From Swiss-Prot:
GO cellular component terms given for this protein: nucleus
Phylogenetic classification of the source organism: Eukaryota, Fungi, Dikarya, Ascomycota, Saccharomycotina
Region (Disordered) residue spans: 28-138, 689-731
Alphabetized GO MF terms: ATP binding; ATP hydrolysis activity; nucleic acid binding; RNA helicase activity
Protein name per UniProt: Pre-mRNA-processing ATP-dependent RNA helicase PRP5
InterPro entries xrefs: DEAD/DEAH_box_helicase_dom (IPR011545), Helicase_ATP-bd (IPR014001), Helicase_C-like (IPR001650), P-loop_NTPase (IPR027417), PRP5/DDX46/KHDC4_KH (IPR056149), RNA-helicase_DEAD-box_CS (IPR000629), RNA_helicase_DEAD_Q_motif (IPR014014)
Tree of life domain: Eukaryota
Main enzyme class: hydrolase
Protein role: ATP-dependent RNA helicase involved spliceosome assembly and in nuclear splicing. Catalyzes an ATP-dependent conformational change of U2 snRNP. Bridges U1 and U2 snRNPs and enables stable U2 snRNP association with intron RNA.
EC number: 3.6.4.13
Chain span(s) of sequence motif DEAD box: 415-418
Motif (Q motif): 255-284
Localisation per UniProt entry: Nucleus
Length: 849
């Protein structure tokens, strides 16, 4: 039995061993088969991937070439196009952020990293071969992203946002994302567009056929006025603060509201609700002139009723026109103001006349206010817009200029025009005027009329009538002028505190007397305004006064708009309140209760003094203006000595009056020697010194006589700022005049204007200043004219020998509008003045030991 069992075990073990060997052989063959299969699969994958990569690369290269070709075409079109494009910086930021998000989802495979993946193009996604039937989650994500983007862009367009230049430029290659090179090219184009067209409105050329006719002349002279003789008219104008008229065809002045032919509702509002009595001098002459449809320049002191002078004719012209249709936004009348405070004040006056008439709507558009509400009101349609130039430019450039149409504007008003130009709004106003129909009626009101403003009026207004009121004394006769001379800042601040305490004690006495008389007597409300020269001084004085127990309402441009508005409302609401502010409110603020103005920092210009003192004595009220002078503020003393009336100087302390005259004489003597100069408020030329240096080198004896003459002329100009406009400006004799010829040429039915400005004989530095690239680029940017250097330079005493020789050096200015040519020449003359200043400074430096 044991032998049999052992044999069975041996057979079993041999069988197991044989099976193990077979299993091992099978596993080996299986492993070899799997290895061969895996190698074959990998080789097939490599071949497939290489083919797919090659196809993708070829497709990408082909698309890239197509995009670049389109980009080059668009660049060429962009260079040829003269139409400016509005650009909104916030859109560019959002565009960049979107591009960054898309790049973050790119594949990181090494084989495809150089190619990149386009996520916005369905066409490109569909061309990628699919290896299975499952839907790619990346495709789903990008499809939803694209739909979301389209809905967002549509929503933004509906809200009237600006169409971004980059949105148009990035569409050159279909809807695919561009690579880094394409994005760089597009960003460069966007930058060029920004530099060329940021906040620049498109000039509109109107043909007579597309302009809707409108009526300008509504004035019918009453029998009483028409029966007046020329002698009676002259006597009436003399009695009305010596009205001076320039221009032809000016209507006769009126003396009663009933002579203007106003409607019954307007007459009731003026006489019974607003309690307007007789007409002011500017209203007597300006209202008939504007109602006759003439362009008017009104020059009158502040607080003389200029707003009503243009508001009544504007409302009458708007009512006579066809109402706005459903698809028209308007406006028909445009009023431009230098500050938001003045714009809000004008808007309030408009509201008084239109609140009972639903057919006339008014919108106030100023910076610092919410633009969304302004846009909503404009979309509903408005007949009158009161705006600051900067905000109106913003609105005109919204939605590529499609938000607001200027086609219906027939009446344009520039209130406080000298301040508009003093704040540097001339380029914006020029752009706005190019969008308005040429047969508009334009009215310009100002307290002063400098040469720069005169030049603008000549270009824009058509045969205007100039009305000047009280030209021999621009300071309101109801303002009592005083001053105090201090020898330190501490002494000046002590004088300020003393003036405020004296004012408070006076009001307490008056109030106690009123309390003892009757309960029906109104409480005295006499407000005060303190003007300082800077924001830092305003904050510093406010804190010092608060420490002294004096509460003020401080306002300056550095404070938030809401805080400024709140302080201004508090000043108007509280009785006997004190306003501390900078020059931001030196014009246009109308608070009739102001009885005292304190000029803490001496003014630098005569125009500034006129407007600062004009904050008191509004209408027929009286007021006091006190200037605190330091002993070294000579220019302020000179302005005061020329502005104050003789009876006011006689009423002063003799010692103070003597010191004022000494300071004024010292400044006047310094002007003769070129040591001092009086700023004109519009940048000041300061060229008297240049002339004196030039003539001193030529003839010292003649220089003394001409200095005396210049001093007399300057004194005359201070006493009578507008009388000097009849003669040639003083500065014109001090600067080399630009000789030029203006030509008009018609070719192929188009009219081209060009001018030749001869610069060969100008001094070298002046010639360089006028012909350098920055000057020419600046003029091209401002006017759109083409400027080219022509001819060659000939030294002094040499001329071209014959017609074949090149002419003397000159600048060729070409443009489509004669006014643009004139503006280019004026800008060139300003650069010539800068060159004269440089030449004079170099000459003075070369003579120093």
């Amino acid at each position: 039995m044991e032998t049999i069992d052992s044999k069975q075990n041996i057979n079993r073990e041999s069988l197991l061993e044989e099976r193990r060997k077979k299993l091992a052989k099978w596993k080996q063959k299986k492993a070899q088969f799997d290895a061969q299969k895996e190698n074959q699969t990998s080789r097939n994958d490599i071949v497939t991937n290489s083919l797919e990569g090659k196809q993708t690369t070829e497709k990408f290269t082909e698309r890239q070439e197509r995009v670049k070709e389109e980009l080059r075409k668009r660049k060429n079109e962009f260079r040829k196009s003269d139409e400016p494009v509005s650009v909104k910086p916030s859109k560019k930021k959002s565009k960049r952020s979107k591009v960054k998000k898309k790049i973050s989802f790119d594949f990181s495979d090494d084989d495809d990293s150089e190619i990149g993946v386009s996520f916005r193009s369905k066409e490109h996604i569909q061309k990628v071969p699919e290896h299975d039937n499952e839907k790619d989650p990346l495709d789903e994500f990008m499809t939803s992203l694209k739909e979301e983007k389209m809905s967002n862009s549509k929503g933004m367009y509906d809200r009237g946002d600006i169409l971004d230049v980059e949105d148009q430029l990035f569409e050159l290659g279909g809807t695919d994302d561009e690579d880094v090179e394409d994005n760089t090219d597009n960003s460069n184009i966007a930058k060029i567009a920004k530099l060329k067209a940021k906040k620049r409105v498109k000039q509109i050329y109107y043909s007579p056929e597309e302009l809707e006719p409108f009526q300008k002349n509504f004035y019918i002279e009453s029998e009483t006025v028409s029966s007046m003789s020329e002698m009676e008219v002259e006597e009436l104008r003399l009695s009305l603060d010596n009205i001076k008229i320039k221009g032809t065809g000016c209507p006769k002045p009126v003396t009663k509201w009933s002579q203007l032919g106003l409607s019954t509702d307007t007459m009731v509002l003026i006489t019974e609700k607003l309690h307007f009595g007789s007409l002011t001098p500017i209203q007597s002459q300006a209202l008939p002139a504007i109602m006759s449809g003439r362009d008017v320049i009104g020059i009158s002191k502040t607080g003389s009723g200029k707003t009503i002078s243009y508001l009544l004719p504007l409302l009458r012209q708007v009512k006579a026109q066809r109402p706005l249709s459903k698809h028209e936004t308007g406006p028909m009348g445009l009023i431009l103001a230098p500050t938001r405070e003045l714009a809000l004040q004008i808007h309030e006056e408009v509201t008084k006349f239109t609140e009972a008439d639903t057919s006339i709507r008014s919108v106030c558009c100023t910076g610092g206010s919410e633009m969304k509400k302004q846009i909503t009101d404009l979309k509903r349609g408005t007949e009158i817009v009161v705006a600051t130039p900067g905000r109106f430019i913003d609105i005109l450039t919204l939605n590529d200029g499609k938000l607001l149409s200027t086609k219906r504007i027939t009446f344009v008003v520039m209130d406080e025009a000298d301040r508009l130009f003093d704040l540097g709004f001339e380029p914006q106003i020029t752009q706005i005027m190019k969008t308005v129909r040429p047969d508009k009626q334009c009215v310009l009101f100002s307290a002063t009329f400098p040469n720069k403003l005169r030049s603008f009026a000549v270009r824009v207004l058509h045969s205007p009538i100039s009305i000047t009121i009280n030209s021999k004394g621009m300071v309101n006769e109801n303002v009592k002028q005083k001053f105090r001379i201090c020898h330190s800042e501490d002494e000046k601040f002590d004088n300020l505190v003393q003036l405020i305490h004296e004012r408070s004690e006076f009001f307490d006495e008056v109030q106690s007397e009123n309390d003892g008389q009757s309960s029906d007597v109104e409480e005295v409300d006499a407000k005060a305004i303190i003007f300082v020269s800077s924001q830092n001084i305003c904050d510093f004085i406010s804190k010092k006064l608060l420490n002294a127990g004096i509460v003020t309402c401080a306002i300056h441009a550095g404070k938030p708009y809401q805080e400024r508005l709140m302080n201004l409302e508090k000043f108007k609401r509280e009785k006997n309140s004190i306003l501390l502010c900078t020059e931001v409110l030196s014009r246009g603020l109308n608070v009739p209760e102001v009885s005292l103005v304190i000029i803490y920092n001496a003014v630098k210009t005569f125009a500034q003094y006129v407007h600062t003192t004009g904050r008191t004595a509004r209408g027929s009220r009286s007021g006091t203006a006190i200037t605190l002078l330091l002993h070294d503020e000579l220019s302020g003393a000179y302005i005061l000595s020329k502005a104050m009336r003789d009876e006011e100087i006689k009423a002063l302390d003799p010692l103070q009056a003597k010191e004022l005259q000494e300071m004024s004489a010292k400044f006047e003597s310094g002007m003769k020697k070129g040591k001092f100069r009086l700023s004109k408020g519009f940048g000041g030329k300061g060229l008297e010194n240049i002339k004196s240096k030039r003539e001193e080198a030529q003839n010292k004896d003649l220089e003394l006589k001409k200095n005396d003459k210049r001093s007399d002329d300057l004194e005359k100009k201070i006493n009578n700022p507008h009388e000097g406009h009849d003669s040639e400006p003083e500065s014109s004799a001090l600067i080399p005049r630009l000789n030029y010829e203006l030509f008009k040429e018609s070719t192929d039915g188009s009219i081209i204007f060009y001018a030749k400005v001869y610069i060969n004989d100008l001094p070298q530095i002046v010639r360089w200043e006028a012909t350098k690239n920055t000057t020419l680029l600046f003029i091209k940017h401002e006017t759109g004219c083409s400027i080219t250097n022509k001819g060659k330079f000939y030294p002094e005493g040499k001329e071209p020998k014959n017609e074949n020789d090149e002419p003397k050096l000159y600048l060729l200015i070409e443009g489509q509008d004669e006014k643009d040519i004139q503006l280019s020449i004026e800008l060139l003359e300003q650069k010539v003045k800068e060159g004269v200043v440089k030449a004079a400074s170099l000459s003075l430096k070369s003579t120093k030991y």
